[in-house]
Swiss-Prot record:
Originating species: Acaryochloris marina (strain MBIC 11017)
Extra information: Cyanobacteria usually contain more than 2 copies of the psbA gene. 2 of the reaction center chlorophylls (ChlD1 and ChlD2) are entirely coordinated by water.
Site (Tyrosine radical intermediate): Y161
Name this polypeptide is given: Photosystem II protein D1 2
Residues that, per the record, bind [CaMn4O5] cluster: D170, E189, H332, E333, D342, A344
Record key words, sorted: Calcium, Chlorophyll, Chromophore, Electron transport, Herbicide resistance, Iron, Magnesium, Manganese, Membrane, Metal-binding, Oxidoreductase, Photosynthesis, Photosystem II, Thylakoid, Transmembrane, Transmembrane helix, Transport
Length: 360
């Protein structure tokens, strides 16, 4: 008998790297999207932490009135934020090497652009990584589809809205109070509360919370008991078991009699599709609403829509909301604007009849 031994050629370093990156046996799946996701998110997080702690004030309105957002300049966790880049920069990309000095880059809010661009790249790579991991495991791709809803919302406030308004200074600040300030100003300028797509978003968030609470409570209340009365019902469950862990027939019967028959799902797949689709579709619509309002296609205006027989205005809640919008409008960027168009009451008057003579 003859035995032939053949030496196996060792894999190249590139092949070993590819095998490691695409392996589904790693504790954390990396994937090709992860190769780009990891450095971009690390860059965004590192710059955010440093800027939140110690960035100097930023001339956000471009009028030489810097706004402080970091902890070392007197803010706390609630009021602190990474202030958006200056209105003097507009939509220009502003990397460090475009500034004359590091101080100038910080003064004009360069860290904001660095953070949001790396963050948006990292987030969309995270979506791609979800699809890639599902593909390698033979799963369907709906996880990344669901994640696309918050991703669309992120892109709408950090990219689409500044593009529509003409400056990254209109982007959402990276902080708690900054987020609320962004919401108030958005309401004042676009009347988002009266936009149908925002109403869908409210229905998606609040309705999704309600549906999740209802589903979780029904499942927890109809667990199939495999233990004695003296033991927790949780001990009767084994990870990966083939049997149903709860009785969907009992849950369907309970909920159908609590409200009415057709308000309850009898099919588990239909139920879980609805639980996933409802908030996702509504957040998609919200992102679409912000993206359209970015180009000033604003919410409905029902101001002074009701008058009596004498022609006098009968105020409605739309008029109350409009007064609140005007209050927000005059409070923000107080020194950056003079007489906003929606507050101008009379005809415009010239402030100078002739050009001044400069002797110098």
């Amino acid at each position: 008998m003859t035995t032939v031994l053949q030496r196996r050629e060792s894999a190249s370093a590139w092949e070993r790297f590819c095998s490691f990156i695409t392996s589904t046996n790693n504790r954390l799946y990396i994937g090709w999207f992860g190769v780009l996701m990891i450095p971009t998110l690390l860059t965004a997080v590192t710059c955010f932490v440093i800027a939140f702690i110690g960035a100097p004030p930023v001339d956000i309105d471009g009028i030489r009135e810097p706004v402080a957002g970091s902890l070392l300049y007197g803010n706390n966790i609630i009021t602190g934020a990474v202030v958006p880049s200056s209105n003097a920069i507009g939509l220009h990309l502003y990397p460090i090497w475009e500034a004359a000095s590091l101080d100038e880059w910080l003064y004009n809010g360069g860290p904001y652009q660095l953070i949001i661009f790396h963050y948006m790249i990292g987030c969309i790579c995270y979506l791609g990584r979800q699809w890639e991991y599902s593909y390698r495991l033979g799963m369907r791709p709906w996880i990344c589809v669901a994640y696309s809803a918050p991703l669309a919302a992120t892109y709408s406030v950090f990219l689409i809205y500044p593009l529509g308004q003409g400056s990254f200074s209109d982007g959402m600040p990276l902080g708690i109070s900054g987020t609320f300030n962004f919401m108030f100003v958005f309401q004042a300028e676009h009347n988002i509360l009266m936009h149908p797509f925002h109403m869908f978003g409210v229905a998606g968030v609040l309705g999704g919370s309600l549906f999740a609470a209802m589903h979780g409570s029904l499942v927890s209340s109809t667990l199939v008991r495999e233990t004695t009365e003296g033991e927790s019902a949780n001990y009767g469950y084994k990870f990966g078991q083939e049997e149903e862990t709860y009785n969907i027939v009992a849950a369907h019967g309970y909920f159908g009699r609590l409200i009415f028959q057709y308000a309850s799902f009898s099919n588990s797949r239909s139920l879980h599709f609805f639980l996933g689709a409802w908030p996702v579709v509504c957040i998609w619509l919200t992102a679409m609403g912000i993206s359209t309002m970015a180009f000033n296609l604003n919410g409905f205006n029902f101001n002074h829509s009701i008058v009596d027989s004498q022609g006098n205005v009968v105020n409605t809640w739309a008029d109350v909301l409009n007064r609140a919008n005007l209050g927000f409008e005059v409070m923000h960027e107080r020194n950056a604007h003079n007489f906003p168009l929606d507050l101008a009451a009379g005809e415009s008057a010239p402030v100078a009849l002739t050009a001044p003579v400069i002797n110098g």
